[in-house]
Amino acid sequence: MDERIISSETVDAEEVSFETSLRPQTLSQYIGQDKVKNNLTVFIEAATLRNEALDHVLLYGPPGLGKTTLAMVIASEMGSEIKTTSGPAIERPGDLATILTSLEPGDVLFIDEIHRLSRAIEEILYPAMEDYCLDIVIGTGPTARSVRLDLPPFTLIGATTRAGLLSAPLRDRFGVIDHLEFYTEEQLTEIVLRTSGILDTKIDDLGAREIARRSRGTPRIANRLLKRVRDFAQVRGNGTVTEKLAKEALTLLQVDPRGLDTIDQKLLHTIIQSFRGGPVGLDTIAASIGEERETIEDMQEPYLLQIGFLQRTPRGRIATETAYNHLGISYEKEV
């Protein structure tokens, strides 16, 4: 399957390395998410003044909005070391126990995709989060006994794209729960200009805004599009990313003015032309366009809902009049 240039997931190790090189180090350098930043600034300063670990933090929202970056920034602001892992990587209770017992006082433990932890793993986390202790069972059968190990004060930062899949007991143990929202065009323009400076790429304000406009409210996509448009500027232009060049390059990359690609358009066309605009169930849509249900839920639907192209109802998904207009299809409202 071909790489989607507007996918909000990281594509490969090279892109992970690229993102790491762009990451801000402080909250003041972090662009966007102002409400989240303002609250975290207070919480971090208060914890520092009390010489305590920051409360456990849950960050949730669509992929590519900066959850991992924000976790790194929090650790940096606290002057703490950060250890990173992910839900799928913690397969056995012993895996988590090894990580927890390696923590030093004040460390930050970042668990990406925390919703994918098994219930058995979650149960080990409960006392670790609440009481900074770890209950382990030694032996088996009638001779088995439980031993409690003390852990140093630490901060757990969990990140998820699907907060609804977290169990209530785990969710309730986070003292700080923040939702990361899609970025505005102005914020993404600022991000594109910042990234172009790091990449030593010449770009004008209108060129940056054109890239931002097609970036689906997502910094990861904005940075990826900038890299590709930069290639066109060097090969087919004079090295400077202008509005005209950005439009031409993104059109060739099949990213339309609202940030939709051929897969998004296929989804909308299917709802409109095969199912009379809906409502139609997500499983039916997935089967019709050859995509996984989870891919549509995580990668396509949030943005299409955000820009008003889709509506989610108890009976299924509906394509809106705005979607019809964008695709140039006549909209006839049923009476």
UniProtKB/Swiss-Prot annotation:
Q: Name one GO cellular component term.
A: cytoplasm
Could you tell me which residues belong to the region Head domain (RuvB-H)?
257-335
Question: InterPro entries, per this entry?
Answer: AAA+_ATPase, AAA_lid_4, DNA_helicase_Holl-junc_RuvB, P-loop_NTPase, RuvB-like_N, RuvB_C, WH-like_DNA-bd_sf, WH_DNA-bd_sf
Residues at which DNA binds: R293, R312, R317
Annotated region Large ATPase domain (RuvB-L): the residues are 1-183
**Biological process, per Gene Ontology:** DNA recombination; DNA repair
Compartment(s) of residence: Cytoplasm
SUPFAM superfamilies per the record? P-loop containing nucleoside triphosphate hydrolases, Winged helix' DNA-binding domain
Binding, Mg(2+): T68
Residue spans crossing the bilayer: none
Please give the residue ranges the record annotates as the region Small ATPAse domain (RuvB-S): 184-254
An example molecular function term from Gene Ontology annotations: ATP hydrolysis activity
Provide the primary localization: cytoplasm
Write down the Pfam families for this protein, in alphabetical order: AAA_lid_4, RuvB_C, RuvB_N
Does the record carry Protein transport as a key word? no
- List the EC numbers from the record: 3.6.4.-
| Source superkingdom | Bacteria
Q: Which reaction does it catalyse?
A: ATP + H2O = ADP + phosphate + H(+)
Q: Which UniProt keywords apply?
A: ATP-binding, Cytoplasm, DNA damage, DNA recombination, DNA repair, DNA-binding, Hydrolase, Nucleotide-binding
Q: Which residues bind ATP per the record?
A: L22, R23, G64, K67, T68, T69, E130, D131, Y132, R173, Y183, R220
Which PANTHER family does the record match to this protein? HOLLIDAY JUNCTION BRANCH MIGRATION COMPLEX SUBUNIT RUVB (PTHR42848:SF1), PTHR42848
Q: What's noted about domains in the record?
A: Has 3 domains, the large (RuvB-L) and small ATPase (RuvB-S) domains and the C-terminal head (RuvB-H) domain. The head domain binds DNA, while the ATPase domains jointly bind ATP, ADP or are empty depending on the state of the subunit in the translocation cycle. During a single DNA translocation step the structure of each domain remains the same, but their relative positions change.
The job of this chain, per UniProt, is described as: The RuvA-RuvB-RuvC complex processes Holliday junction (HJ) DNA during genetic recombination and DNA repair, while the RuvA-RuvB complex plays an important role in the rescue of blocked DNA replication forks via replication fork reversal (RFR). RuvA specifically binds to HJ cruciform DNA, conferring on it an open structure. The RuvB hexamer acts as an ATP-dependent pump, pulling dsDNA into and through the RuvAB complex. RuvB forms 2 homohexamers on either side of HJ DNA bound by 1 or 2 RuvA tetramers; 4 subunits per hexamer contact DNA at a time.
Return the NCBIfam families for the record: PRK00080.1 (NF000868), ruvB (TIGR00635)
Family from the record: Belongs to the RuvB family.
What this protein is called in its record is Holliday junction branch migration complex subunit RuvB
Its gene name is ruvB
